[in-house]
Amino acid sequence: MTRLRKVIATLAALTAAVATTAACTGSGGDTNDTIGAPTPAADRTPLSLTVRPKAHATGLPVSTEIGATVAGGSVDSVRLVDAHGDRVDGSLRADGTSWVPDRPLAYHRRYTATVVAVGARRQHIERSTTFTTMSEPGNRVGTGMYVQDGRTYGVGMPIAVEILRDVPKNLRASVQRRLFVRSDPPQPGAWHWFSPQRVEYRPATWWQPGTKLTVRMALGGLPLGHGGYGDTDRTATARIATDRVELRITNRPKQLKVYQNGKLTRTMPVSLGKADAPSSSGHMVIMDKAAHTVFDTRGIPGENYVAPVDNAQRLTWGGEFIHAAPWSVADQGHRNVSHGCVNISDPDAAWLFARTHIGDPVTVSGTGTRLATGNGWTDWDMDWATFVAGSALPVPDSVRHAKAYQPYPKR
C-alpha cells in the first residue's frame, strides 16, 4: 500500500550468528578437538608443530584464534586457559588451520594455549604459547543478524548479517571467516556481500522442511577497520518449518496463489501498485509480519497519509507489503490502485497471515518493474553462479557446482 522508508515493526530483531563459505555441514568451528589420522605421506615426514600467536605477543584482539602448522601429523588437541587457570572451550576449524574459542576472549587478559599433535606412529609433540589480549576498545561497531533463537522460518529464509559501518574490502574475508552456519541435515550454501555493511547466506536450493539451523556470528572484538571492533558475538538455533509455503503473485491475472508443499491451496484477487507506484517483480521472501500497524507516509515526497493496517507482511525495505485493504476490495482482481503493495481483502489477509512464516518465498511477476538487488532479502532473485561470486572467500567446488535452481517463475 505504501513505500515506507522505515520498518513497521522490530524486523526479526538483530540477534544471532552466521557462517563461512563451506557451511553445508557446519563451517568454521563446528568440528571436534580431535582430527582424523594422519595421511600415509606423513609416515615419511618428521613430526613438527608450530603454534600461533607468537609467544609473549600483546595487544591481541579478543577474536584471536589458536593457529597450528603441523608437518608429519595432525592436531590432536588444543587447550586454552586464562591466567586464573579457567579453561576456554572451543573447536577446530574443518580445515584444521586454527582453533576457534566458543566465545570472545576477555580484554586485557593473559592466556596460555597448549597444542598437541600426533604423528603417523602415534608419537606426540606438544607446544605452548602465552599471549595477552588488548585493552577494551572505545570504538565498538554495532552488528546484528536477522535470525532469532528458537524461531521457525520459511524455506527461503536467508541468514542476513548487518554491520553498522562499511567494512573495507580487504577485511571482508576475515569477517566472513567468523560467520558460522551448520544445517541438519547438511545442505550446501554460500555467502554474498550485498553491500559493505550487509552479507547474507543462503543454500543452493530452498532449505529442506524441518531443517535445524545453528548459527554463530563471531564478530565480538574482531577488527572491522578504521579503528573499530565488533561489539559482540551472537548465536541462535532455529528451525525451518515442516511445511513449504510459497506465494505466487501475478499482475495478469491479478491473483495471489498460495501453495503448500507444492499443492495449490487458495487463490485470492489482488490489487497491485498503480502506474506511478508499481509493485516490484522478482523473487522475495516475507521479511516481517505485523498483525496491526500504522503506515505513516508524512514527510515522504508525494505522500501524506496515516493509515492503520492489519495483517501486514513486509516484502522489501522500500515499503512493499502484502496487507489487508478493505478500501480496495472492489478493485481487487480488476485494477491496480495501491502505492506498491499487494492489496487483499480482510478475510484473505487474516487467513494468509495465520499460515505464513518469515522466510516464506514470494514471487511477483508481470508488473514491468524489476526488483532492485538488495531491496529486501533478494538472495533468491539471482542465479547461483552470481550469488556465489559475491563471496569474499573462495567457494569450494562442491558448493559452487551444487545443484541449484531459480524459484518459479523465471523472469
Model-derived segments and spans:
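Acidic, low-complexity Ser/Thr/Gly/Pro-rich repeat segments typical of extracellular/periplasmic
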Residues: 2-21, 25-243, 398-405, 410
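Short, solvent-exposed loop/turn elements at domain surfaces
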Residues: 77-79, 170-172, 256-258, 293-297, ...
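Short, charged beta-turn/beta-strand-edge "cap" motif at the junction between a beta-strand
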Residues: 117-119, 219-221, 262, 292, ...
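Exported/periplasmic cell-wall-interacting domains
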Residues: 155, 244, 281, 290, ...
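Solvent-exposed, polar/charged alpha-helical surfaces in well-ordered, non-transmembrane soluble domains
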Residues: 157, 161, 165, 205, ...
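Short beta-strands and strand-coil junctions in structured, solvent-facing domains, enriched
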Residues: 168-170, 222-225, 255, 292-294, ...
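A structural motif detector for short, solvent-exposed N-terminal "entry" segments of globular domains
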Residues: 234-274
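Conserved hydrophobic/aromatic pocket- or pore-lining residues that grip, position, or stack substrates
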Residues: 256, 286, 313
